[in-house]
Amino acid sequence: MKCFFINLDRVPERRTHMEREFRKVGLEAERFAAVDALRIEDYENVRYVPHAGARWEIVKSQIGVFESHRRIWQAMLAQDLDMAAIFEDDMFFLPEIVDLLSRLETAAPQFDVVKLDSAFYPVPLSAPELTIGRWPLRRILSDSTSCGAYVITRQAAEQLLAWSDPYCDHIDDFTFSPRPGWRAYQAEPVVASQLTLLPRDFADRYVNARQTVVQSERNIDPRLRQKVAKAPFPRRVRKEVNRTMRKILWRVHGRRRLLSSGGILSASRMAPESLYGEDERDLSPDGLGELVDPAERS
């Protein structure tokens, strides 16, 4: 399966890190130059339009990330690929990723996208709908943070390109949010993670790479963290009413219906034996905080 990783030209440290990760597990990958959020105006065919989606506005860094993923989807079509694995440049891989990618390559067209990583907070997932080797695939039933590692089919890339013309949303919410007929799955246990989400005692082995991630310009450059305009008051009221109703429905019916159908509320962790051998310690990343129902998230 063709693998891409997204990397800004001016952050070679992350490129070095990702090349090391791919070598570690024996995979080859093509570097894809990320869209530079500081030069968005220099790019042609940027499809971001304020208010044209789930959000009212998004910041430049989010536009750059979204455009980078869109352009990889376009590259898939240009290269006539039936499927591809797409990664951001702050990832850690388990060796099992090789087996999972190989098995997924033979499983199409049973899915549109398969999420390989996790942000390690609870997300409602369906009962297993497919089993790929040791990995049950559960349909993602809510927003799911992180677009750091996923497999996508050609047909799904075409569909996402159409849906995102125009767009105003975060790339992870846009890619994995439930839609009628959209087959977005979570593979469990996960085989990849952003470095900042790894268990502290394990991630300390990657201290230099972690520092590179922590120093991401998205977090520290004020030019990329400009304030966005608030939606008009009536829209904000409607959004809050809808959010409150979803909370009520989740508490009254949602959780029970999910569990009775074989679904789970899962944080999609890495298998302890994959990280630590037989030493099964708590893999909750530092600072995760109290686990909350998905309806509690704004």
Task: Give names to the regions the model predicted.
Residues 1-87, 91-298:
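An acidic/histidine-cluster motif and surrounding catalytic segment
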